[in-house]
């Protein structure tokens, strides 16, 4: 039984390079949407007229007017470090786990491929999250701070000040809800993407790759973009409340530098944050920022998977 495909021809190091590069490209394009998402998630007032941020377009206009256009790329350096480190670890671990499953029991792999894609994606994302999480926390602080009342002078300063004033554990604030969020999110994402790109879209002539490097028919760049966007939509909708809670936990101890953004939330843990959010703002508050977040999720997922697969094909073409 042959399982020769694109993954089996790519080494772990090559997968890591492709994943890191895909993360860097995606982050540079999508960073403004991330800034908008975080600003909405941290706003306690209802998202309506009269609030600090009442809509996507109003928020963009307000940020540019008050803080300058570069504020839309606030925290970009730690965000890039986060995306690159996360991408290279996630994709290399996923490919390695997939190769292990294929070699260990080819028949079992084929019979349970979608479930294994979910499990491998969840494990890979968990490993990548733990390794890259400090970058995420620092990035959130830099995005969340009021630019006229800055607490930090850049990435390095933020990192050192947080450790000095709050301890090294402050770099991992919100890790628990993040793992609870990212494991099923990535599992769903990989499972849906692989299902669409390897079992559905690659069977439609319009989405087939014309010059495939594999013995199986593969989906094209357009097909991968579509598969990635749908995977991002499904997975983000399923786990979004955990993302809101994570962001709110990451700014605990930092509220004095956000006074211009309105009311602040003070919570001591994941469950406390969930209860407090629902009791004070209502159940739908767990979906604050869903609009820009969904735009970002669809864009990022589409670019991440598509760019990753294109880089893998480029690597294979360069091989003798």
What does each of the following model-derived ranges do?
Residues 1-22, 37-53, 57, 69, ...:
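Flexible extramembrane linkers and terminal tails adjacent to transmembrane helices
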Residues 26, 83-86, 128, 300:
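Residue-level signal for conserved functional micro-sites within the alpha-helical transmembrane segments
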Residues 29-32, 36:
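Short hydrophobic motif
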Residues 63, 67-69:
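Periplasmic/extracellular loop-to-transmembrane helix junction in inner-membrane transport proteins
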Residues 79, 83-91, 189:
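Specific transmembrane alpha-helical segments of multi-pass solute transporters/efflux pumps
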């Amino acid at each position: 039984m042959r399982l020769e495909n694109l993954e089996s021809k790519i080494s772990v190091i090559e997968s890591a390079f492709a994943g890191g590069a895909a993360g860097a490209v995606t982050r540079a394009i999508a960073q403004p949407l991330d800034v908008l998402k975080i600003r909405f998630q941290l706003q306690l007032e209802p998202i309506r007229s009269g609030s600090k941020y009442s809509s996507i377009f109003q928020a963009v206009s307000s940020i540019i007017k008050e803080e300058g256009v570069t504020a839309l790329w606030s925290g970009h350096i730690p965000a890039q470090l986060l995306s690159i480190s996360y991408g290279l670890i996630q994709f290399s671990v996923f490919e390695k786990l997939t190769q292990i499953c294929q070699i260990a029991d080819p028949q079992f792999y084929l019979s349970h491929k979608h479930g294994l894609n979910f499990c491998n994606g969840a494990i890979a994302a968990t490993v990548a999250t733990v390794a890259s999480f400090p970058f995420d926390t620092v990035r959130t602080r830099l995005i969340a701070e009021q630019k006229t009342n800055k607490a930090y002078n850049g990435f390095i300063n933020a990192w050192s000040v947080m450790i000095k004033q709050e301890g090294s554990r402050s770099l991992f604030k919100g890790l628990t809800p993040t793992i609870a969020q990212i494991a099923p999110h990535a599992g769903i994402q990989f499972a849906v993407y692989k299902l669409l790109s390897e079992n559905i879209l690659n069977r439609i002539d319009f989405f087939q790759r014309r010059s495939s490097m594999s013995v199986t028919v593969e989906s094209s760049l357009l097909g991968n973009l579509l598969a990635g966007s749908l995977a991002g939509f499904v997975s983000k909708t399923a786990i979004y409340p955990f993302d809101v809670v994570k962001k709110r936990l990451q700014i605990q101890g930092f509220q004095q530098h956000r006074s211009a953004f309105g009311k602040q939330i003070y919570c001591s843990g994941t469950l406390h944050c969930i209860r407090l959010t629902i009791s004070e703002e209502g159940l739908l508050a767990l979906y604050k920022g869903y609009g820009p977040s969904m735009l970002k999720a669809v864009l990022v997922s589409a670019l991440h998977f598509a760019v990753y697969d294109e880089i893998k094909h480029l690597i294979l073409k360069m091989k003798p």
